[in-house]
């Protein structure tokens, strides 16, 4: 194996600064002889920029960048004080404690959190805009009157990558108008046991079907590589989730153990990730 220094970061839409939250510092160990893509070293100029930002941050700010609170557990004043790197709306969570809030209320909260996150910091600490992430797996389903699309198990039955791409495009527009930057989707789990309670989130038990459909949703949400408007207006950040093997846990236990020959497991459960990466996730 080879050891590659690894730093993960994602761009926020409202700033030229890069998000320091959601990062892992340290080595990433990857197989040097593998049919999976090898991690690429980050750009040295970006490395230097990030190192400069981190060097000017207090321990408290660094910790806050790694925390992703749920919207019903904190306020804009808390954001102003702690400067969380990102936040999310979880199940049944809505702005100001109202899960049935109109889209305008979601946008209002997004603006409040963003403005709180970019207020000047004391002592010259860098200002890093926060990000809001949501689970819009088959449409922006947390919002009343948003479009709800068939779930992944049904879209997988169509084998229609263009249809899935258009679902992503429509979903991105509806997410953006509520002020949210980031979608926790696509789910590229390859379900192997129907007892798993999230089987409906999987496009198929066949990785050859999951891979192109997951990549298509990435393109729909973010825009295609080479498109000058990629990650611009009408687009949001995508996420290939959840983790290697989540669709193949023993007896279908959610977030359970995955056992078996590693090469056989990789052939099934790792296969969709290179396609999502190639699509720009």
Describe every region a protein language model picked out.
Residues 1-3, 20:
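Acidic, Ala/Val/Gly-enriched low-complexity intrinsically disordered segments
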Residues 7-15:
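Low-complexity, intrinsically disordered Ser/Thr/Pro- and acidic-rich segments
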Residues 18, 22-25, 33:
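Low-complexity, intrinsically disordered or signal/transmembrane-proximal segments
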Residues 29-281:
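Glycoside hydrolase catalytic-domain context in secreted enzymes
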Residues 6-7, 27:
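Composition-driven detection of intrinsically disordered, low-complexity segments
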């Amino acid at each position: 194996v080879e050891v590659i220094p690894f730093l993960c970061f994602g761009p926020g839409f409202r700033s030229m600064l890069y998000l320091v939250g959601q990062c892992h510092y340290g080595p990433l160990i990857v197989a040097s002889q593998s049919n999976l893509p090898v991690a690429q070293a980050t750009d040295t100029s970006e490395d230097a920029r990030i190192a400069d930002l981190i060097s000017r941050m207090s321990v408290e700010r660094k910790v806050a960048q790694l925390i992703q609170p749920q919207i019903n557990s904190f306020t804009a004043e808390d954001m102003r004080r702690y400067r969380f790197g990102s936040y999310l709306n979880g199940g049944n969570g809505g702005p100001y404690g109202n899960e049935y809030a109109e889209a305008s209320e979601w946008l209002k909260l997004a603006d409040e959190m963003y403005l709180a996150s970019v207020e000047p910091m004391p002592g010259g600490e860098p200002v890093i805009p926060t990000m809001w992430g949501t689970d819009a797996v088959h449409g922006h389903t947390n919002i009343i009157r948003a479009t709800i699309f068939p779930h992944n198990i049904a879209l997988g039955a169509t084998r229609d990558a263009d249809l899935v791409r258009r679902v992503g495009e429509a979903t991105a527009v509806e997410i953006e108008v509520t002020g949210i930057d980031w979608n926790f989707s696509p789910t590229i789990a390859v379900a192997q046991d129907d007892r798993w309670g999230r089987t409906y989130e999987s496009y198929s038990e066949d990785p050859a079907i999951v891979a192109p459909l997951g990549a298509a949703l990435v393109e729909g949400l973010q825009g295609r590589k080479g498109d000058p408007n990629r990650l611009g207006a009408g687009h949001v950040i995508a996420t290939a989730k959840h983790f290697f093997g989540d669709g193949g846990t023993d007896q279908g236990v959610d977030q359970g153990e995955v056992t078996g020959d590693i090469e056989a497991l990789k052939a099934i459960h790792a296969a969709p990730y290179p396609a999502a990466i190639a699509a720009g996730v």
